């Protein structure tokens, strides 16, 4: 499997959280990131205010913030302009 750039993984996390908040296990699965490494990606996003931790039903979940949503939308705009395919 080809190694993905960290930027792509960060954006995949935002894309998944755009759909709905997720716990770390489901988030790691959805983004195809090893559970042991997911925190390495979540921490910088949280420190920059792009995601937040919440408690939901006694479980820790992550949700996208307004800033994270804006960044994700900007990224989609750039991505759509690239000559891919």
How would you label these PLM feature ranges?
Residues 57-75:
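Basic, amphipathic "hinge/linker" alpha-helix immediately C-terminal to the N-terminal HTH DNA-binding motif
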Residues 1-12:
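Short alpha-helical segments that sit at the start of domains
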């Amino acid at each position: 499997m080809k190694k993905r750039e960290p930027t792509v993984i960060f954006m995949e996390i935002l894309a998944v959280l755009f759909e709905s908040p997720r716990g770390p296990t489901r988030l790691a699965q959805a983004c195809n990131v090893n559970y042991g490494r997911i925190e390495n990606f979540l921490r910088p996003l949280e420190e920059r205010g792009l995601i937040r931790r919440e408690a939901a039903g006694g479980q820790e979940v992550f949700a996208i913030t307004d800033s994270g949503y804006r960044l994700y939308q900007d990224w989609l705009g750039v991505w759509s302009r690239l000559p891919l395919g």
